[in-house]
């Protein structure tokens, strides 16, 4: 792919396990880490994953510590999503968040992640007017936000926009299926690509891949439709609520780690209960302060 800055043709030559330094899924040892600095994952490594029938993991990240933790845990792609709107800034949807709000988050993630590919969402209203607007916004995210790639929502209507961005040197991940920025026109959170509508998503994916998108993300799409899309295009696919045939999977980290309360979407698997852990820690701290147990002698000068 033209978006890569690396001349390596082999994924295993550059990137640590599972993409190098030993058999697939083998954990890196301390001696491995000491031998050489960790190399940055590039878009062509994701392509190699699809070509080899391998998979990669993607999580959202919005600030330093989660970026560091997920990067050290081996997550290959970090998404500075417009989901920050309702997971950081307290909005009900992703629509209100702006470019100027996302850029500082993007910088923090890009500075903190030493290995992961950092992808930034272009928020609603920042690319729809014209290809020129999209290129200008994309440049800001690479130049000011330090992102390595951007993501835009929409089907084949945006193929020319993707083409213009790629020609300008901006790697683009396309996002089809349920597109949260279009929730009002789609009638709310609804599965896309059922029945006869499946062909529309296939056509969208083909057009976007041909325009130069390095990957196509599908959200809330039936597993059979997602498999058909994945088979129809050469570039890697990413799924969120799209079955397990995609090359990559993505989740919002607060959902994955159990930080957000309330009912989770069907496609979310919760791997921790951080909300309860943090609540218990805050309660214990408050109790210690109110009863005079903190700070104790060991915390005083």
From Swiss-Prot:
Gene3D superfamilies per record: Phosphoenolpyruvate-binding domains
Record-listed Mg(2+) binding positions: 82, 121, 153
GO cellular component entries: cytoplasm
Binding site for 3-methyl-2-oxobutanoate: 82-83, 121, 151
Pathway named in the protein's UniProt entry: Cofactor biosynthesis; (R)-pantothenate biosynthesis; (R)-pantoate from 3-methyl-2-oxobutanoate: step 1/2
Localization of this protein: Cytoplasm
Catalyzed reaction equations: 3-methyl-2-oxobutanoate + (6R)-5,10-methylene-5,6,7,8-tetrahydrofolate + H2O = 2-dehydropantoate + (6S)-5,6,7,8-tetrahydrofolate
GO BP: pantothenate biosynthetic process
Record bears the keyword Transferase: yes
Record-annotated active site: 219 (proton acceptor)
Main localisation: cytoplasm
Protein family (similarity comment): Belongs to the PanB family.
Protein name stated in the entry: 3-methyl-2-oxobutanoate hydroxymethyltransferase
Native source organism of the sequence: Arthrobacter sp. (strain FB24)
Gene from which this protein is expressed: panB
